[in-house]
Amino acid sequence: MENFNFSIWEVESQSKIERVDICDDESSYGYEPQCDLFLKEPDRFSTNNLVARLCGKEALHQFKKGDLVAVTLRYWRVKRNNKYVTRITIDDIKLVKELKLWL
C-alpha cells in the first residue's frame, strides 16, 4: 500500500556525486549525473531533515541554500525478515518560486 505526502522543504546544500554508469541493455552503456540534496523543514525550531538523491535532469539543476522546494514523498511498506517496514522515496521535487502560491 502506498501513501503520498506533499510538503515544503528548504535547501541546506547540494553535493554532486560522480556520474555513475547506467546500462539500458547489454549493448549500450552511458552515464547519469547524480547529486544529493540536503533539505530541512523551513521552521527554525524544527530538527527534521531529509536527503534527496537526484538523478538525471533533476541532478543538473543547481539548487542553492535557502531555496524552497515542493517535495512529494511516497511511503510504502515492504516485508523484510518476516516484518513490514516503511520505506520513503521522493516521487517528485520542484523549486517553489513563491511560497504564497502554495499556502
What do the predicted segments below correspond to?
Residues M1-L103:
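Single-stranded nucleic acid-binding surfaces, predominantly the OB-fold ssDNA-binding core
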